[in-house]
Amino acid sequence: MLTPIIRKFQYGQHTVTIETGMMARQATAAVMVSMDDTAVFVTVVGQKKAKPGQSFFPLTVNYQERTYAAGRIPGSFFRREGRPSEGETLTSRLIDRPIRPLFPDSFLNEVQVIATVVSVNPQINPDIVALIGASAVLSLSGIPFNGPIGAARVGFINDQYVLNPTTDELKESRLDLVVAGTAGAVLMVESEADILSEEQMLGAVVFGHEQQQVVIENINALVAEAGKPKWDWQAEPVNEALHARVAELAEARLGDAYRITEKQERYTQVDAIKADVTEALLAQDDTLDAAEIQDILASVEKNVVRSRVLRGEPRIDGREKDMIRGLDVRTGILPRTHGSALFTRGETQALVTATLGTARDAQNIDELMGERTDSFLLHYNFPPYCVGETGMVGSPKRREIGHGRLAKRGVLAVMPSASEFPYTIRVVSEITESNGSSSMASVCGASLALMDAGVPIKAAVAGIAMGLVKEGDNFVVLSDILGDEDHLGDMDFKVAGSRDGVTALQMDIKIEGITREIMQVALNQAKGARLHILGVMEQAISTPRGDISEFAPRIYTMKINPEKIKDVIGKGGSVIRALTDETGTTIEIEDDGTIKIAATDGDKAKHAIRRIEEITAEIEVGRIYAGKVTRIVDFGAFVAIGGGKEGLVHISQIADKRVEKVTDYLQMGQDVPVKVMEVDRQGRIRLSIKEATTPDAEAPEAAAE
């Protein structure tokens, strides 16, 4: 008989339940975690042995949403879930980032975490539930893991922090921040904010970390009751003698190599040193393992760079700890794009474009939480040439999706509302060179390109990546880190914002012991760097251009009586299709009668407006119109009087005398004046030619189209 073991606790305004022992008993561990009807089933499987020759930790995290969780059937052709959506990919990364640093450095066994959303309450985002589940299964599994971790979402409403706000509450919140960490340290932060101060952001991180302690306590209690035995795994002992020999041969040479400021030249020199040392040691003793020598070389290399920083010496490229690399900022460099910018910071460079489209260009997103439309898109591309490599070129990888989302978070707070600027906007960042923080270069480039496109953003935004080197109580925070400093350091801390505050904060920490003091230093140092970059950007362009590009569609707005919408659309869309073909414009109609006309030519837009005014104009009884015969029948003729309206001239209303045959007086396409005699309740129009041709009749009002 299956007997589940359950922990239930209050987490802010929600009740969380963690259950194990009922399902997936062949997995290493499995839990069902629920928070107010949002339930995520999380499993972990770990291989007992590492693959021979394995050189990295093969951790895989898959987060997947099932449409049955929301009581729906997939809308795809095959009626089943397909490749991961962008949201699923981002949540997979969100889970991966805080758990990866908690595995031992030398643990190389394959581990796979799968989180499946099986029930969803639209008010509760499953990502926090999935994070709690991943922490619980790894803690229960016995796999070497220095957890558990907790996770929390923090909102900021009416100047108060809110723990795990609902979907509706988030709409009113100036902050959407996710924080994860162990009992003693924050490990990961992901956030977007509506221009909050550094103090408010830091307060949110600390608040979330304090509140999530209840999660850690309950997971520990569950492990005590249902946890599996710890694996009998021991790290391979360090070969101290070999380590000393490698350090003796390589340390000084690597120190010299890391004084080379140009990245590719430095890499070439470092690779040559490693090859020389490996060859020399193998020549002395062919029983040595080349892979082990390479691992020790990597350790020596890391120590060389870190110790220099901690001693206060210049960094790899000769900078002091708070110096920003040289900046080059240019706008309007691509003649036919709607907006463009080239942002260069040292050896990191982004070519960024902004394209304006209409509402029909917006992205329709069908998520588990419901359907929504996104009119601001930001895409990030990282081709292999940007780091001097060859490789596959194709659909975006997880990293590109994640970096694009971070850059979008950085810009989102300053974007105009749809009523202020009724365009769909797509920003694309092409990374043409990379040596540290290309995502923050994308934020800077996006701000510049949007201004160049004439998008009325509220303020310029810039981003900067901070790093950390920490040994014991000694630490140094680095501004504008290089790729090597990111790889060899203890923290990747990215901040984007305007002169007035922070718009996005992302933090990934590889060690425990990051204190509030360190985060405060990093935020303050990042603010200084951000303001410096903004100053340089403002020299290139300080405010959005006064007009959009001549190649961008211009949107003209007009309002009609909602009851006339059917007239503009026509039967089966016939009228609006004819209008767009005739005028060469794009026409969009909203339910309240608002019509948006997009055109690259102002005359075409004016023509479309005039035609819509004709179609929606009220027909006045007693007024004479210029008409055109469109159909002839035995009992009269149908005459178009403009604006897509047509009326009947009865045979008795054609002439003052008796008419035996309509075609004796009228022909198809003939222009005739007609007087409106009546418009009945069904909108049918009765016309008269003879009343319009009396001597005292007024002149026709307008020619028929």
UniProtKB/Swiss-Prot annotation:
Pfam families: KH_1, PNPase, RNase_PH, RNase_PH_C, S1. Residues 553-612 form the KH domain. Residues 622-690 form the S1 motif domain. InterPro entries: ExoRNase_PH_dom1 (IPR001247), ExoRNase_PH_dom2 (IPR015847), ExoRNase_PH_dom2_sf (IPR036345), KH_dom (IPR004087), KH_dom_type_1 (IPR004088), KH_dom_type_1_sf (IPR036612), NA-bd_OB-fold (IPR012340), PNPase (IPR012162). The keyword Magnesium applies. The keyword Aminoacyl-tRNA synthetase does not apply. Its EC number is 2.7.7.8. It is found in: Cytoplasm. Keywords: Cytoplasm, Magnesium, Metal-binding, Nucleotidyltransferase, RNA-binding, Transferase. One of its GO terms (molecular function) is RNA binding. Its cofactor is Mg(2+). It catalyses: RNA(n+1) + phosphate = RNA(n) + a ribonucleoside 5'-diphosphate. One of its GO terms (cellular component) is cytosol. Mg(2+) binds at D486, D492. One of its GO terms (biological process) is mRNA catabolic process. Disulfide bonds: none annotated. SUPFAM superfamilies: Eukaryotic type KH-domain (KH-domain type I) (SSF54791), Nucleic acid-binding proteins (SSF50249), Polynucleotide phosphorylase/guanosine pentaphosphate synthase (PNPase/GPSI), domain 3 (SSF46915), Ribonuclease PH domain 2-like (SSF55666), Ribosomal protein S5 domain 2-like (SSF54211). It comes from the Bacteria. Component of the RNA degradosome, which is a multiprotein complex involved in RNA processing and mRNA degradation. Belongs to the polyribonucleotide nucleotidyltransferase family. Involved in mRNA degradation. Catalyzes the phosphorolysis of single-stranded polyribonucleotides processively in the 3'- to 5'-direction. This is Polyribonucleotide nucleotidyltransferase. The gene is pnp.
